[in-house]
């Protein structure tokens, strides 16, 4: 096999690996995870002996879980259909009253991606029970459209406006992330097709075009991943912090889906670099050979 064809085959292999990793990242939900077990243990130690025996070993006692004492009202206000409630929707329904203590927040282990946010099963028996009984949904869709939140009397109007503006900015960041990832997949697919065509027609030209498409895919992936990181940071630092931020002892971070996306970015940049750099390297070698022959003559 000629060196140019070998470089094209290597670039095509890297680009196909990149495409597989990128599609895996897009359609899996493990971009970001939270684990409040350490926070739960510290709350249990600080609250030792304060609760009845049947309420121990819980992050939040069941008697104080949101809407348990008044299910008819809760079912009218909560989204997601009749008879369903999101254990974290209490944030928007209770206002700021019961959030001054970190241990008063019902935090559960979650994982989220571009399209859904889900609760881990088998970690907290409270959320397991709620999901098995059909009271809570295990997964909720990530919003890509703006919906007007409920106006509550116990939240100041100015704070409501700030929350709405933050929701709007966060929505834009999510749209940018998903949009650029979609464009990256489309351009990468075109690059793979052009690289395949280069085996049969105008090898030098098509290889160069494929390299440009691969590098363009890398730019789109970089924009998307940086925007996703910005959206996560923005969401955790929203006002008021006692609602949206996480306690310091809650473990949270990026997971394997976003690692697949970063690996995809590395592969596609390598593929684009090979396709773009090889013609220049080969021309330099030819020029050196010609100059060597002329000098010997």
UniProtKB/Swiss-Prot annotation:
Record's signal peptide: 1-25
Organism the protein comes from: Rattus norvegicus
An individual GO BP term: regulation of cytosolic calcium ion concentration
Glycosylation sites: 158
Residues on Extracellular side: 26-179, 230-257
Keywords carried by this UniProt record: Endoplasmic reticulum, Glycoprotein, Membrane, Signal, Transmembrane, Transmembrane helix
Name of the gene: Tmem178a
Basic and acidic residues: compositionally biased ranges: 41-57
Protein name: Transmembrane protein 178A
């Amino acid at each position: 096999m000629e060196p140019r064809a070998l470089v094209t085959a290597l670039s095509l292999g890297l680009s196909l690996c990149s495409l597989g990793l990128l599609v895996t990242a897009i359609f899996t939900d493990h971009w970001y995870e939270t684990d409040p077990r350490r926070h739960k243990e510290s709350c249990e130690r600080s609250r030792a002996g304060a609760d009845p025996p049947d309420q121990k070993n819980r992050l939040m006692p069941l008697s104080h879980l949101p809407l348990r004492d008044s299910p008819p009202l809760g079912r009218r206000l909560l989204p997601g259909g009749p008879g369903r409630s999101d254990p974290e929707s209490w944030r928007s329904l209770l206002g700021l009253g019961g959030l001054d203590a970190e241990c008063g927040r019902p935090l559960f282990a979650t994982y989220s991606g571009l399209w859904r946010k889900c609760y881990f099963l088998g970690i907290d028996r409270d959320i397991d029970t709620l999901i098995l009984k059909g009271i809570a949904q295990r997964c909720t869709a990530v919003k890509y459209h703006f919906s007007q939140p409920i106006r509550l009397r116990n939240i100041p109007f100015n704070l409501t406006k700030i929350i709405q503006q933050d929701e709007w900015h966060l929505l834009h960041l999510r749209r940018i992330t998903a949009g650029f990832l979609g464009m990256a997949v489309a351009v990468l697919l075109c690059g793979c097709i052009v690289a395949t065509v280069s085996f049969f027609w105008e090898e030098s030209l098509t290889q160069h075009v494929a390299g440009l498409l691969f590098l363009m895919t890398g730019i789109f992936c970089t924009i998307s991943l940086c925007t996703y990181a910005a959206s996560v940071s923005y969401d955790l630092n929203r006002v008021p912090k006692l609602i949206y931020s996480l306690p310091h002892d809650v473990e949270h971070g990026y997971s394997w889906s976003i690692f697949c996306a970063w690996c995809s970015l590395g592969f596609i940049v390598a593929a684009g670099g090979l396709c773009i750099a090889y013609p220049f390297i080969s021309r330099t070698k030819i020029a050196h050979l010609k100059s060597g022959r002329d000098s010997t003559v």
